[in-house]
Amino acid sequence: MIQNSRPSLLQPQDVGDTVETLMLHPVIKAFLCGSISGTCSTLLFQPLDLLKTRLQTLQPSDHGSRRVGMLAVLLKVVRTESLLGLWKGMSPSIVRCVPGVGIYFGTLYSLKQYFLRGHPPTALESVMLGVGSRSVAGVCMSPITVIKTRYESGKYGYESIYAALRSIYHSEGHRGLFSGLTATLLRDAPFSGIYLMFYNQTKNIVPHDQVDATLIPITNFSCGIFAGILASLVTQPADVIKTHMQLYPLKFQWIGQAVTLIFKDYGLRGFFQGGIPRALRRTLMAAMAWTVYEEMMAKMGLKS
């Protein structure tokens, strides 16, 4: 009798073992820790991102010659759109930040394991690690970043994330989904590189072996605040350019044109509009994300 030579079908137990093995992989753990930390920080600081976007896109005719501050925009949003209006754009923010932060930390962990092999990074290595990891995450999440920016601006009435993706693709093509990508990378990659450098260097100054274990998260958070402020100041102009290119891709088609038009309409000050809410949000988000990430990685027995 001829025996059936076909391989046996994969059993449910085998599938379960494979999934369990994947979940135990350090890179997957780093991705999960990063995703959870990104969720926490996004929920808390979304209003600051919305205020930043509104401040950056105010037209001179909207307020005459008067300078509009963050508090005035905050009160206007609450008055016209309710308190929950401050969380407009939350869905694309979550869709962007949760996997985006996970991709960032997962890539960062992989690069550190491959290139550093256990030794602490130098200042230059920290910059390169941050730039590389953020670039990967930025390219992957660019379409969601475009949608998030348009939601927050209040100038687009998309019904859902899927509807927004379909509308942008039909009206602007695939380029519309990646509008402002160069400006985004010029903003995010240097921010992550500069942030990681200052964060690691500041942590190296602090004698962690002499700090009470319960105070280590607070110490790490403080280091993150310091690093975030410096990185935010350096990358603010790129953020303004990115916002305009994503909201008005037909008007701002390339970076040089965007720089010229923003300077013409707003002057040098235009490149720093929305700087305060952005610095607050980016600094607090990065500090919280890194603190939560490092604590979770330590609980899993992994070195972050």
UniProtKB/Swiss-Prot annotation:
InterPro entries: Hem25/SLC25A38, Mitochondrial_sb/sol_carrier, Mt_carrier_dom_sf. It is a multi-pass membrane protein. SUPFAM superfamilies: Mitochondrial carrier. Induction: Up-regulated in the brains of patients with Alzheimer's disease. Gene3D superfamilies: Mitochondrial carrier domain. Preferentially expressed in erythroid cells. Solcar repeats lie at residues 25-114, 121-205, 215-299. One of its GO terms (biological process) is erythrocyte differentiation. It catalyses: glycine(in) = glycine(out). Disulfide bonds: none annotated. One of its GO terms (molecular function) is glycine transmembrane transporter activity. Its main location: mitochondrion. The chain crosses the membrane at residues 31-56, 89-115, 127-152, 180-203, 219-245, 274-292. PROSITE patterns: SOLCAR. It comes from the Eukaryota. One of its GO terms (cellular component) is mitochondrion. Keywords: Disease variant, Membrane, Mitochondrion, Mitochondrion inner membrane, Repeat, Transmembrane, Transmembrane helix, Transport. It is found in: Mitochondrion inner membrane. The keyword Ribonucleoprotein does not apply. PANTHER family: MITOCHONDRIAL GLYCINE TRANSPORTER. Belongs to the mitochondrial carrier (TC 2.A.29) family. SLC25A38 subfamily. It is linked to Anemia, sideroblastic, 2, pyridoxine-refractory: A form of sideroblastic anemia not responsive to pyridoxine. Sideroblastic anemia is characterized by anemia of varying severity, hypochromic peripheral erythrocytes, systemic iron overload secondary to chronic ineffective erythropoiesis, and the presence of bone marrow ringed sideroblasts. Sideroblasts are characterized by iron-loaded mitochondria clustered around the nucleus. Mitochondrial glycine transporter that imports glycine into the mitochondrial matrix. Plays an important role in providing glycine for the first enzymatic step in heme biosynthesis, the condensation of glycine with succinyl-CoA to produce 5-aminolevulinate (ALA) in the mitochondrial matrix. Required during erythropoiesis. This is Mitochondrial glycine transporter. It comes from Homo sapiens.
